[in-house]
């Protein structure tokens, strides 16, 4: 154990178990850490945590998505680590003081979110949403022709972690994938053809499926 660093304080707002808290404590080493997250919120994506005023005054780092207006109540804040991939609301002028570092959870959601996207695509192709809506009324009418993804083309707008995961799932069922990103020279797993945003209008006509994974979507 080194010297206890009383000039730093991490306020952790995540809904952690005791064993997870222990892992954060070990990772922080000699920097003190206060846990204010509610473990009963596990399984929900609307995590909220009440940060006491005395901790706001001392916090040099916050882990979690505090309300943007609370950032101004943390005068010593040097680092905000969100649990979300999107951080748009913290990037508005006046939210974080100059010099504060903002990091996100990019890379944590690629598999789970892309699986949800794929499930929605599959449901639409197979008319599952129509059959599900008919179920409570005991209506078993034919919803029309189902579509196979095999041989179809998916246009993936935004090929970061989530977009590239989705492209790989599409490839696994026989789809051709076209990816769009700011720098088309950078390849992404699962993408057959990469183009820039300036070519979007040119390829829309070839897409059977359009999936978006860009900021604020």
Per-region residue spans from a language model:
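Short gly/ser/thr-rich secondary-structure transition/capping motifs
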Residues: 40-47, 60-64, 134-142, 189-197
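Phosphate-binding beta-alpha-beta segment of Rossmann-like dinucleotide-binding domains, i.e.
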Residues: 99-153, 179
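Alpha-helical elements of Rossmann-like donor-binding domains used by nucleotide-donor carbohydrate transfer enzymes
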Residues: 23, 116-120, 202, 206-209
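Short, well-ordered alpha-helices that flank and scaffold nucleotide-derived cofactor binding pockets
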Residues: 26, 119, 123, 168, ...
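Rossmann-like dinucleotide/phosphate-binding beta-alpha-beta segment
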Residues: 145-217
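General small-molecule cofactor/ligand-binding pocket signal
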Residues: 34-36, 103, 178, 195
